[in-house]
UniProtKB/Swiss-Prot annotation:
InterPro entries: 2Fe-2S_ferredoxin-like_sf (IPR036010), 2Fe-2S_ferredoxin-type (IPR001041), 2Fe2S_fd_BS (IPR006058), 4Fe4S_Fe-S-bd (IPR017896), 4Fe4S_Fe_S_CS (IPR017900), Beta-grasp_dom_sf (IPR012675), Cys_rich_dom (IPR004017), Helical_ferredxn (IPR009051). This is Uncharacterized iron-sulfur protein MJ0092. Residues 123-155, 177-205 form the 4Fe-4S ferredoxin-type domain. GO terms for cellular component: plasma membrane. Residues 2-84 form the 2Fe-2S ferredoxin-type domain. Pfam families: CCG, Fer2_3, Fer4_8. SUPFAM superfamilies: 2Fe-2S ferredoxin-like, alpha-helical ferredoxin. GO terms for molecular function: 2 iron, 2 sulfur cluster binding; 4 iron, 4 sulfur cluster binding; electron transfer activity; metal ion binding; oxidoreductase activity. PANTHER family: GLYCOLATE OXIDASE IRON-SULFUR SUBUNIT.
Length: 489
């Protein structure tokens, strides 16, 4: 027997109850066992028992899961889905969801009915097949950071709109509805994709495609055009403030005993804002036996434009970088920006080179014996690294290898900067950032480490605002993992 805990609600107060249940059964079976053997009368929803109806979704150890397909574990905590009004025990109020579905017209709309029988081409049906796989479990809504702080309805609503927007029979302008339903509030953190039991890629298959369609029809965020102007003028998404990194460094930095030769993709912020981070990266790579080639004519990866629907600029930048990096004789291209790495890996389909995050490279060539560093730190998982590239073990392996460094792990949560939200919807970005800042301060650390210049900037700003608003004396530093390593090699 093992022990699990269930969060109860009797209509007036919440409380926790623990029960012993058999091993090797599902959470749904455990709840039924508890009601039968303990007469607990826990209320919950369930129907198909086969992961098809979505009704049994609950929060398990902090993550939304289907009770019918999740095995019980000792110490497991079961709660109702977060982000919804709780009616009783594990039952949440789904009524607002269904009303909103009707509000966005989740049905095929024809304005001009065909006179003859239409033949659906299999290719078009297949394109939308993934979007039709939703089982309405509402897991994605329960974890969406934008929905939590704004009137953005959430991922599954955008999936519904995309489902019809890309159906050639529908004639309702779903991209316009998406625009007015605040599709640009989405940070593209892909937490919705991570928790979806049907593995629907809502970010790439729905959000970004709807944004591209909306942009083509003139529905966009005005501030995103400023970023567009920057890249068309400077080949960077930000304006130059001091001498760029690419004008400060050499073309090649050889390692003494070369284990690997890489091309360094700097990204916009490291080139134009965080030049010292770029220099630290070169120093750290060389110290680990990695020679560094630095192409001076590289440009923005295009991530801000892929994410915000500006496909024309994104494709133009991609072509430029492919022409540069496809010619290089290196083992791989290394990035120190989560957004750049995710874009190169996932959007550069025509590339002839392998892309690796710097933490991948360092753990593969072998970590050094680092100098001790007395510091209490936590790590922020950039969304485009953890979910965009499936990299989360390597940074932790590096941090845990530094002697005397006290590492406090916290929940992986979006900082609010991505998906064009920091530039286009700063108020939304700040609200999400405030939540992240609170978690970091609650960890009582000296510094937060990350592997994304964009996260670094936004978390630093969020911590500063949180400190001032709450009159906190403690200062928490924010740094890229390469800058931390530069201190201990």
């Amino acid at each position: 027997m093992i022990k699990i805990t269930v969060k109860r609600f009797n209509g007036e107060k919440e409380y926790l109850e623990s029960y012993e249940v058999p091993e090797n059964i599902t959470v749904l079976e455990a709840l039924e066992y508890i009601n039968k053997h303990y007469e607990a009368n826990i209320l919950f929803r369930a129907s198909c028992r086969n992961a098809q109806c979505g009704s049994c979704a609950v929060t398990i150890n902090g993550e939304p899961r289907l009770a019918c397909e999740t095995k019980v574990e000792d110490g497991m905590i079961i709660e109702p889905l977060r982000g919804f009004k709780v009616i009783r025990d594990l039952i949440v109020d789904r009524e607002p969801y269904y009303k909103k579905l009707l509000g966005i017209k989740n049905y095929l709309i024809r304005k001009n009915y065909p006179e003859e029988l239409e033949i659906l081409i299999p290719k078009y049906v297949e394109e939308n097949k993934e979007l039709r796989g939703c089982i309405d479990c509402l897991s994605c809504l329960s974890v969406c950071p934008a929905r939590e702080v704004s009137d953005y309805p959430g991922p599954t609503f955008m999936r519904q709109l995309a489902r019809f927007a890309f159906d050639k029979r529908d004639e309702d302008g779903r991209e316009i509805t998406a625009y007015f339903e605040n599709i640009y509030n989405c940070t593209t953190c892909a937490k919705c994709v991570e928790v979806c039991p049907k593995e629907i890629d809502i970010v790439h298959r729905a959000i970004e495609k709807l944004r591209a369609l909306a942009f083509s029809k003139g529905y966009y965020i005005e501030n995103h055009l400023k970023v567009r102007e920057n890249v068309l003028k400077y080949n960077r998404s930000v304006v130059e403030e001091e001498l760029p990194l690419l004008k400060q460094v050499a073309d090649f930095y050889p390692a003494e005993s070369e284990k690997l030769r890489v091309a360094f993709f700097t990204g916009c912020l490291v080139d134009f804002r965080l030049q010292n981070v770029g220099k630290d990266a070169i120093k750290v790579l060389n110290a680990h036996g990695v020679s560094v080639v630095i192409p001076k004519n590289q440009v923005c990866c295009g991530s801000p434009f892929f994410r915000t629907g500006q496909r024309d600029v994104a494709e133009m930048l991609k072509r430029k970088n492919l022409e540069i990096f496809n010619k290089l004789d290196v083992d791989c291209v290394v990035t120190i920006c989560a957004g750049c790495g995710s874009t190169l890996k996932n959007d550069y389909k025509e590339r002839k080179f392998e892309v690796k995050d710097i933490t991948e490279v360092l753990t593969e060539v072998g970590l050094l014996k680092y100098k001790p560093l007395k510091m209490r730190i936590t790590y922020h998982d950039p969304c485009h690294l953890r979910r965009g590239q499936k990299i989360y073990k390597q940074p932790r392996e590096i941090l845990k290898s530094i002697p005397e460094l006290e590492f406090i792990d916290i929940e992986a949560r979006c900082c609010g900067a991505g998906g064009g939200v920091r530039s286009g919807k700063p108020d939304i970005a700040n609200l999400i950032g405030k939540s992240r800042a609170r978690m970091i301060y609650d960890a009582n650390v000296d510094a937060v480490i990350t592997v994304c210049p964009f996260c670094e900037y936004h978390i630093r700003d969020s911590l500063k605002r949180f400190k001032e608003e709450n009159k906190i004396d403690k200062e928490i530093d924010v740094m890229n993992i390469v800058s931390l390593l530069a201190k201990v090699i």
